[in-house]
Each structure stands twice: as structure tokens, then as C-alpha cells.
Amino acid sequence: MAEREVETGPRKRFEQKSDAVFDEIVENCGVMDTEMSEDTDHNLTPTLASMSYGMPNQTGSENSLLDEDDYFLNSGDLAGIPVVSSDNEDEQDCSSKDNLVSSVHTDGSLEVERRAAHQESDNENEIQIQNQLKKDFPKQFDQVSVFKSIRKDFCLVRENSKETFSGKEKNRDLTYHEREKRLDKPHKGLDSRLKSSFFDKAANQVEETLHTHLPQNPETNFRDSSYPFASKESIGSELGNSFASNIRIKEEPLDDEYDRAVAPQQGLLDRVKDEPDNAQEYSHGQQQKTQEGELKISAVFSVSGSPLAPQLTTGFQPSLASPGMNKMLPSVPATAVRVSCSGCKKILQKGQTAYQRKGSTQLFCSTLCLTGYTVPPARPPPPLTKKTCSSCSKDILNPKDVISAQFENSTTSKDFCSQSCLSTYELKKKPIVTINTNSISTKCSMCQKNAVIRHEVNYQNVVHKLCSDACFSKFRSANNLTMNCCENCGGYCYSGSGQCHVLQIEGQSKKFCSSMCVTSYKQKSAKITPCALCKSLRSSAEMIENTNSLGKTELFCSVNCLSAYRVKMVTSAGVQVQCNSCKTSAIPQYHLAMSDGSIRNFCSYSCVVAFQNLFNKPTGMNSSVVPLSQGQVIVSIPTGSSASAGGGSTPAVSPTSINSSAAAGLQRLAAQSQHVGFARSVVKLRCQHCNRLFATKPELLDYKGKMFQFCGKNCCDEYKKINNVMAMCEYCKIEKIIKETVRFSGADKSFCSEGCKLLYKHDLGKRWGSHCKMCSYCLQTSPKLIQNNLGGKVEDFCCEECMSKYTVLFYQMAKCDGCKRQGKLSESLKWRGDIKHFCNLLCILMFCHQQTVCDPPLQNNAVASISMVQAASAGPPSLRKDSTPVIANVVSLASAPAAQPTANTNSVLQGAVPTVTAKIIGDASTQTDALKLPPSQPPRLLKNKALLCKPITQTKATSCKPHTQNKECQTDTPSEPQVMVVPVPVPVFVPIPLHLYTQYTPVPFGIPVPMPVPMFIPSSMDNDEKATEGIEDIKEKLATHPFEADLLEMAEMIAEDEEKEKTLSQGESQTSEQELFLDTKIFEKDQGSTYSGDLESEAVSTPHSWEEELNHYALKSNAVQDADSELKPFSKGETEQDLEADFPSESFDPLNKGQGIQARSRTRRRHRDGFPQPRRRGRKKSVVPVEPRSLIQGALQGCSVSGMTLKYMYGVNAWKNWVQWKNAKDEQGDLKCGGGELASASPCSDSLGSAQDHALSQESSEQGCKARSVKLKEDILSCTFSELSLGLCQFIQEVRRPNGEKYDPDSILYLCLGIQQYLFENGRIDNIFTEPYSRFMIELTKLLKIWEPTILPNGYMFSRIEEEHLWECKQLGAYSPIVLLNTLLFFNTKYFQLRNVTEHLKLSFAHVMRRTRTLKYSTKMTYLRFFPPLQKPESEPDKVTIGKRKRNEDDEAPVGVEMAENTDNPLRCPVRLYEFYLSKCSESVKQRSDVFYLQPERSCVPNSPMWYSTFPIDPGTLDTMLTRILMVREVHEELAKAKSEDSDAELSD
């Protein structure tokens, strides 16, 4: 017995000094803990079970607040413990570490299984301990595998837990006595082993505690990383009973007072309140627990952990089995939980700001990591996120557009992309019932189909039967019926079936077909809407919906207003409602507003107390205090009266008992209501100009470091003008009044007008190239461009920072610059160069008001604190003395308030348990309603103890705004020596034009002296007299032709403007007069509707010095093309390849020209009726007016209708394909005109036979051209004059269609016209139909001579050449002398019906006269009349004039034809062009009767008064021009029409 006592004594001393053991193990196991965290093997299984003997109830409820049948942790256990969220919150497991019990036991078999396990473990542990003592102690310590952790996570479900804390204590006491008996029974040989066994158990507990604080991965469950007992299997189970022999344990003198102070007070632990877990437990309640101090914490969030965690662990240390082991062991200092950034994996330091996305659990160190993690730059979207519409089977790209619906027959929900698809699917699902009434089917009034009728509409006394919703919608649209239509989707609202939803917004009732449409309408409109109760303004998307008894949905700004509104509705109705406590039907006298906005009605205050006791049941004391959780307010309604809660007033309340906490709750409600009313009051700003108050978005002006606010744009502009708000314009460099200030690359630029701003942006675009035109976040222009796809839209940003901030703003994680709340920010404002974002208009007004007021306004927290202090002071004295202040109006991170008990463990420092305190960390809110605990003993002096002391820290931000004041001061400049002016007489004679002297003074006098000045007058006169007469004629002509003076003046103005523009541009030389004449762009201005000299400006090119000028411009074009290869890209080159395939003769629709033909025919008849009919037998030709092309094809050049515009890319592509084929065929790459090497074939010559190639070669060799080697170029603009001339000569002979067939002659002319237009479009002045290209014209004339117009089956003539094509490629007009001649030849052929050269040579100036006739309504018409010369009887029979009626020998006179003017387009008017032609001819030829077409001068300028010589034009040149004109379809139509009229007249005669 003495030996047993000797062994037991050291064991007790060891157990009493276990705190020193824990301290030393922490220091020596740091390296082990690190290695253990790195090498974790999850596949190991526990092999040692020796730890089940010494501490069988080690994880009892005092240790971890867990029972064997109840594994759900109380929220009080986790209060203050840092939470590390996992990636998937829905799959979080509540795991527990337990080294004894590995299975869940039921309530009935718990004690039996425990006893059996202890008996079996006693026998096994005795054998294992004996074997363990035989082994070497240091050798076991060297095993590396003992440091590998085994963690098994399992989900603990707490659903059937009904055991109270008192019941748990009884089980613990029973287990404790049984364990005491078993500990006293061991024989003497077990004492030493007990000491070793306990040593190992303590070491395992320390290792288990250290392992829980190791850094965890983001995927680890938060209970694994934060709670010390989160693992099912103990790590120490593999450690065994061995430690290193060199571990030294520090021994200190015993201190019983310290152990007594460390031990938790049993009375306080017995009164810990359980936290309700779910709605079922919350409604049924829990068993009673006494409570002395209650602490309600909504949520605590911290990055580096909470200081309450180690205190909580210390306060709940389990008591050991034996009396000697019943001392409380101090907890090991918890290792700081290391939280890592999910983006860059960096460890977040304590106090560092962390970012978290709404709805996600991942933490980030910065916004760059946040945006980079969520939106990877090259990460494709997962294919699993796409959903398919169940109706149309299309992919729904935007998740917000998904409409989920569940039908009766299926358990799964269906996804739809729109409401129409949902309706269509519902129609398909419904069974089709065919109703046969006397075998007659009913026809739908809309679609005219026989179907089942679903709608019958009585409209205008007619019943319309409709078969479907689609037909019903079409019927409503056709008749403009808008009854019962959904405001969101436009569908029909079936009000009779109760499916119609009514939303009361802005004083109007809007109807919706479903609740989804109501929500969608709120999100889309997002209007500022007043609350239905307090009338405070707020965005409709943020308000709370409530449907009243009438079915209308109203909007409320907060849960408080919704609760007050429901109380008002219940009390104002005066109906009996079932009490939520006693279930009796009576008029409610008390209402309890819950945190979710719902209302609980009670008939008496006792029912209120009974209802709250379901959640908080105090025992052992009769307290009159009813603790209120956050969000609960008791409203008392006096008997026989009702509370009014309209407008912004609060409902009338009266506390039943002055000593109850209901009075304090009502005081808090009143304080909160007053604060909300103050914060929601509309703030008005004062306009800086008109001094009026306004509540709209202000117009801001940043000038000289000050911000000026205006009510509108007009006031801002007027203020700038009055106060001379001027700055240097960034574009025009002139100091003017600022119109707008724009930010470019971080610098503000001022502009005087919108034009200057646009021009400056245009210049920047040329310099920068691809740049950010407008940053989506900071609204500035920057040369750097960063794009990101957000919400299906590509946004532009100027830098990474702006993209990061915009992403935070897009995902509604940014905070408002006004109210500092996080959420959707729909308003923005530019303030001092920065963009501020706000929730709504109220926040903008509040922000601007705060900036204008000198003293900063009180913050929300300060107002709330003041209100709550006043509320607390208004209560009874006893209540103020016993309770702590309540912190209100703080945004909570928890979804619902939860009352979480806790125990203060600072008794070691103070020696007594103080009142419960509150701690605010970050954005968390803490509310404390507690009673004063009984007084404790005075603190005692402690001796040499290391305590875990962590002060409660609080971060406080103070906003200090300095008072700014402007004061003008002046610094005196250093004084300079004063300069004294001393007059010194100087003997200088100064002549003064005054009569001060007696002698005469010379005065300058001007005498006009004639000086001869040489002048060069262009004239072809032979002698001086004729020259003088020519000068007089020119003077008279200029005086009598004012329109020509206008032409010359317009040409001079255009030349002067061009000179000024070239002078302003740097590096450009003056434009000479010859360059002005040759530059096409100078004169290609917009052609107006008046004459005003535009004909003169069209005169661009002349035939003088053609070869030199064309080579010069060809070389210049080559340089331009090399510098800018993208001058004219082949935009349509891929499509415009085969002209005849795209425009076949079969597709010609003569109806497209019907309008013009009818107009011409009517005009001809009208003019014929207006002319007096001659009495002679020969009928006079009617007037042929010019076809008003502008009415059909547009007034501007090149803007014709499809099918009427010249597609010049056909010619360019044909040239390109031909050159490619030519270069590929000829190895030398030389173009040889003539000889045997001119083998012609098509680009697709592979489909042709060798016989065709040989025939083409023979045909080309017969041309007789001199062989010249020319390198062909695909780009026609790069060809010189000679290359282009020879190339075109060969091109028209060898070009083929893509299928290898030859082009028709009209198609070849079409291709050549396209090439001509392409040259003009790109700045080349070459006219390929003039004398320098004579060889090409000869070959083209030969080719066109064999062409005859195609007669279609309907009788119309077909040709691909139209009149508009000649106007577009500048072959008609007044651009040059030869073009003007070609235009007159065209008009004479078309309207005078002159078909050959012989008939045209009969024209003369004497036979063509300009006449004017007055028509109806006093309108005048100018026309040209041509009188053909008399036919001589001896004229040869083969020279009969075609197109004119054959006359008998007794005819009196030939018939005169007329050509009317074109008033719609003066530039295409035949009369004006003829007058312009006369002005450019010599006076000597204007009365000649033998000539009409004159030879152009070799050298002339546009300002020259004469373009033509006195000699007639060569008949060969005239024939070449006429051949091309006869290819025009409109000419053949006019000739055919005139021929038919002549034949009709002959038949009538």
C-alpha cells in the first residue's frame, strides 16, 4: 500500500503541473508541427487505442459542447473564432475530432456501449502499456510516421437533438463517478504506467490543438481549420506513449488560487443558452437553460482571427477524471490562422484589407487578384453553364434570361429563353380537345384556320373568335387594343383567374402577368420611387415588395416600414386574428415585428412573453426583462384604439410595464425611425447662377480649383459668359469661353466649341491609331487600349486599374461615394477630375451638399449613437443602470440575427466576472442586452504566471476636413533706384508742317504719269484692229453674261480656298495655276440645284501636254501607292467578278424604268399640246424634255438605285485577273503588242482548247503593233501612261469571263468605264477615251461597231450601258473641252434623233436656236430648237436621214425638233451646257452655218475665255465618240420611240 502511495504521489504532482507541460511542449513541438502539416497522409488508420483508458470522456460537452448523439456545434462555440470559408459553401461539413468514439450512438444505447468499450479497453491497454515500457523511449521518438495526420471529414447532422445542457451535465456526472471507481481499482503495477499514459494523452491533446491551427487550403472546411475538435480521428493515436528524452519540464511552486481562478464558474456555465439551429427548432423551442448575461452577435468577420477564440477555448476546458485532475489546464496559445489570397496565394496579414465577391466565399488581397481570378483573359466559359430552351432548343447565353418553370407531370424544372417560348410549351403540353358542333369547325378570325377557339372578343358589336394567344396578340395590335396587357412582356393578363399582378408605383397601377415580370420590370426601370409608408425616395430595384389584401403590390424602403405597414393594416381592419401564442381569435393588442418583416399578433402581453420564452426560457429567477433580438420590436395597441402609421410618422406605442425591455425596444424603434427620416430627407442644392434650389442632378463646373453647381446647362453657359470663364482652346489656340472640358491621358483639355473637340479627337486618332476613345470607367481618352468582355458587351479601358475598378463596379461590389454602402451604383458624377459613383440621385445631392458646407455633416454611425444614447437615457433609471447601450444602424454580415451566448474569460486578470462587453470588428454589428452579474471577489496578486492577454482593439476613422479660405496677398518687389528725367536741350531742327517760319516750305505733290504695262490677251486675231474688236467683244460678253462671271468668280474662290488650306498645312508648297487646273478634287464639289458657275468648276482636264502630264501623275500615283498601300482596297473584289452572270439579260426588269418612261411620255404630250399646231401638212416634232434622273436615282453623284450604278470593281477585278493570267502565261512577263507571242486566252484558259489559244494568237498577231516589252502590274493605279495605253489595247482583246467565255461588246465597254471611274476615284486624271489613248480608242471602236442591241421577248431593248454610267465616270459634263463635246453629241443623238456622223455634221450654230415659251400658270420654259437644212432634190438616195419622216416633194419645210431644259439638275441641263459651249467659242463662229462641233485648243486653262478653235472637229473622232454613245440603252429607247411616233403619224396621214 505504501508502494502504491509512493507511485500515486508523483502522478498527482504531474497532473497538477500539467500546465507547465503544455507550455514546454508548445516550444519544443514547433518544428514537429510544421513537418506534420507538410506530410499529411490521409490513407493511414489508427493503430494504437491505448489513449481510451486514461481519458474516456475527454471530448465531453464541456470540452467541445458535443454529445455522442448530438454532433452539431452550437453557434456560441464558434463566436469569435475566425472563419475560413471554402469554395463551396453548400458542401461545408461540420466535422469533429474525437480520439475515442468513432461512430454515432443513439440515446438509448449510449451508456451501455460506453461501459462495454471501457471494459474492453482496460484489458487491451494493460497489455499494450506493459509492452510499451519495454521499448526504448528515444527510438520511438525518431519515427517519422507518428507526425502524419489522419483527418476524416464527415457531415454531422443535428436534427433530432432534444437533450438539454442540464441533461448533458447529468450524463457527465454519471460517467465521472464510474471513471473514478475504475481509476481507484488498478493494482500497484499500473501507477507508473498511468503517469506515462497521461503524459501521452496530454501530448496528444497539445498536438491535436496545434494541428487545428495549421494553415489550411481554401477548400478545407472552416471547422477543420478553426475549431480544435474538428477531426474524427486523433493525431495522437499514432504518436503512442513516447516523447523525446531531452524534453525538460519546468517546475514551479503550486498555486491553488490561480487554478481556482482559471477554472470556469459552474453557475455561469450552467446558464449558457443554446443557439437555435433551424426553423423547426426555432418554432418548437429548446429546453430551458438559465442565463445571467446574454450576448446577441450577428456575425464577426476577421482576416487574421479573433481574440475571443483562445478565450473561448480556455473557458470551456474539460475537467479531468480524478479529483487531482479536476484542475483547469490553461490553453495553448492559438497559432494565427493563415488565410491566403485565392488569386496570388499570398498570406493575408493581420489588419490587411480583404476583398470578397458578393455570393462567394473566396478572399482576395486586391481588386487585381479579384478581377484576374474571376475573369481570366484566355479562359473560355465552361460549357456546362449554357442552358438550352425546352421549346426552341436554342442556347441561352445570358443566365439572367433563363425562365425556369415546373409542370404538374414532371418533377424537374424546364428552362426557357423567353415568355413566348414558355407559353408555346404550355400550349403543347395541354391536351387538345376537339369540339365538334354539328360537324362544323370554327374558323379563327385572325389566321383563318379551323381550330379550337380560345378567345372570343366582342369588338364593335362583332364577336371575333381567336384560336391562340398569338392570334389574340395580333388582333390587339391590329386594332390598337391595350387592355389587360403586361407592362413587361406585353402578354395578356387573365384577371379573372387571379394570375394578374398589380404593382402600385408612381401613383399608377401597372399590371403584370406573373411575379417574374414584376421583378424584371423593377430591375429594368429602376426608378426613384417613394416608400408606401414613409414616402422616402429610393430605387425601385432595392425596395421590398408586399402584396396587400386587394392584390396590389406595394414597395417599401425597409423591413421596418413593411412591419409598421402590416401593423397598421391589421389594426385598422379591426378584425379578429388568431393569437400566435394562445391560438385564440381576438382583436390583437400587441404585435411583434420579426427580422424577416413578418408580424406576430398577440392578444395580451402575457402571450408576448410566453411567445418569447419559446426561444429564451430563463429559469431560477423571475426576471421581468424580455430580451429582444435584433430586428424585433414590440408594439402595444391600447384597447379600443388603433395606431396610425401613415406618412413619415411612427405608430403610437405604449409600454405595458415600465420595467420591461419592451420600453427600451420601443425607444430604439423611435430613435431608428427618427434617424431614417433625417437620412432620407431630400437635400436641395442652390444654383450658382439663378440662386434657385433644385433637387436634380447638378451641372458642375471646375474652374480655378473650385466646383460650381448649377441647375442646368443653360445656367452654366450663362454663368460662363457673365463671369468670363475663359481658357485657351486646345485646338484653335485662341482664348475663348470654355464650352467643354475633356480629359485626355490624365490632363484636362478645354475647348471652345463642339467642332474643335471633334477635330482634336480626329487628329489624335490619326496620331495614336487604335486607342481608347472613351474609357468606360474614368471617361477619358488615352492612347492605351484595354478591352474586356463584361456581361456580353466589350468595354474599353485606358489602363488595368480602370478595368479592375469597373469590374468591381459591374459586379456590385463597389461602395457608394456618398452613403458608403455596397451594392448597385446607378449614378455617376465627375468631381475634380475623378469619377464618383452613387446609389441614386439622393446620394449625389447629399455628396454635393457635404462638399459645399464647410462643417462636415455627422456620420451615420454618430447619428445612430446619439439617437441610441437618447433612447437609453429616456428609459427608467434601473434599466439604464443594468443594461449596456445598443449599437444600431450598422450593416450586418449575417442573413438573420442570431442570439449567441458567450462567456467572458478575463476573470484571471480581474479576479471576477465583469459585465458582458461588445466588440466591433470591420463591418460586423454586435448588440448586447445583459444583466449585471453578481459581484465577485477582489482581485488577488498573482505570482510569476504567463497569461494569454489580448486587448480588445477597435479601429476608428476620423474624417477631418480643413477649413479653406482664400486671401489675396502681394509681395513687394525690391525697390529700384528712381530714374530722374533731366531735359537736355539739343540743337536739332525738326521740320513741322506748320507755318511757323517766314520762308516757304517744300510740300510733296503727286503728278499722275502714264506708264505702259504689257498685258497678254489670248486672241487669234490677225491684226491690231481685230484684236481691239476682240477685247471689246470680251468686255461686252462679260457684261451680258452674268452667269459666266459667276462661274469665273466661283472658280477663283475655290482656288483661293485651296491655296489657303495648303498654306496652313506644313511641308506643302503653293499650288500653281496649272496644278489647280489638273487636280480633279479641287473642282469635284457638291453639285447644287442652281447654275452658279458649277459648269466652270467641272472643267478639269484638257488635252494639252497629255503624255507629259499623265506620266507625271502616274509617277506621283506610284509614290502615293507605295506610301499608302491601303488607299483604295478591293472592298468588293471577292464578289464582283462576273458581270454578265450578275446582270444577265433575263433579269432586266423594264418596270423599274416605268416611272421615268411615263413621266417622259406625259411631258411630251403636254408640250405638244402647249405648242400651236401648224396648218401645213407636215407635223412638227414635239419637245423632248430631259429625263429628271435625280428623281429616280438621287440628287448626289454615285447615289443611284441598285442596278443603275456603275460597279467599277468589275473592271478592276477583270484587269487584275487578266494581268495575273498574262504574267503566268508569259514567262518573260512582257507585254508584246504584235508578233507571234501575243497569244490571247482567258484567265481560265484551262477550260479552253489549244485550238482556241492558237486562234486567239493568230487574231492578236494581225493587229500589226510594234513589239514592246512591258511589265504588267496588277494594280492599275501603278501603271504609267504608256503601260496603261498598251495594256488596255491588249486587255479588250484577251479578257474573258471566269468560265472562259468571251464578254459581249457592251460588257467590255462597261469594264472600261469601270476602270475610268476607278482612276478618277483614286486621283488619276487620265481619260482613256481621249486622244492620248488613240490606239485603244481605235481598237475599242472596231469592237463596238459589230454590236447591236438585244431585243428581249417582251419587246424591250437590253444593254448594260446606261446614261447614268457615263455621268458617273465623267464622260458627260463640262469637265474638259472634249467631254463637253461628247455631252453635246449625246444630247443631240438622244433628243434630235441624229444617228450617224453625216446627220451630226449638218448641225450648225445658225440652225440651233435658244427659245423661251410661256406655258400654263405663267410658267416659262427654255428649249433649244433645231431646224434641219432644206433637202436638195439631187441628194443621193443613200443619205436619207434616219429617224425623220419621209416627205413628199411638195412638203413646205422640214420639221424642227426641240430639246427642253432640265430644271431639276442644272448640271445636266442641255440648254445650259449649250450656252456654256457658246461662251467658250469665238464670236466669229457663232453665226456660221457649216460647223457645230469645233476642234479643242491644244493648250488652255479653265479661266481661259476660249476652249475651242475655229476649225471643225475631225469626223473620225466624232465617229469614235458616237459609237460609244450608241451603246447607251436610253438612246436606243428614245430612237425607237421616235420611230414609232413617225410611223403612227404616217398612218394617220
UniProtKB/Swiss-Prot annotation:
Crosslink (Glycyl lysine isopeptide (Lys-Gly) (interchain with G-Cter in SUMO2)) position: 139, 148, 195, 201, 232, 250, 273, 289, 327, 400, 428, 430, 1035, 1062, 1081, 1128, 1432
Xref: SMART domains: TRASH
Superkingdom per UniProt: Eukaryota
MF terms in GO: zinc ion binding
UniProt-listed InterPro entries: DUF3504, TRASH_dom, Znf_MYM, ZnF_MYMT-QRICH1
Region (Disordered): 83-108, 267-291, 1124-1185
UniProt feature, compositional bias: Basic residues: 1161-1182
Glycyl lysine isopeptide (Lys-Gly) (interchain with G-Cter in SUMO1) crosslink site(s): 250
Positions where Phosphoserine occurs in the chain: 109, 121, 161, 197, 242, 1065, 1072, 1182, 1257, 1540, 1543, 1548
Modified residues (Phosphothreonine): 106
Keyword Metal-binding recorded: yes
Keywords recorded for this protein, A-Z: Acetylation, Isopeptide bond, Metal-binding, Phosphoprotein, Repeat, Ubl conjugation, Zinc, Zinc-finger
Zinc finger (MYM-type): 362-402, 414-457, 464-499, 510-544, 554-592, 600-631, 708-742, 749-788, 795-829
Residue spans of biased composition, Polar residues class: 97-106, 280-290
Residue positions where N-acetylalanine is found in the record: 2
Residue spans of biased composition, Basic and acidic residues class: 1125-1135
An individual GO BP term: regulation of cell morphogenesis
General function of this protein: Plays a role in the regulation of cell morphology and cytoskeletal organization.
This protein's name: Zinc finger MYM-type protein 4
Species assigned in the record: Mus musculus
Gene designation: Zmym4
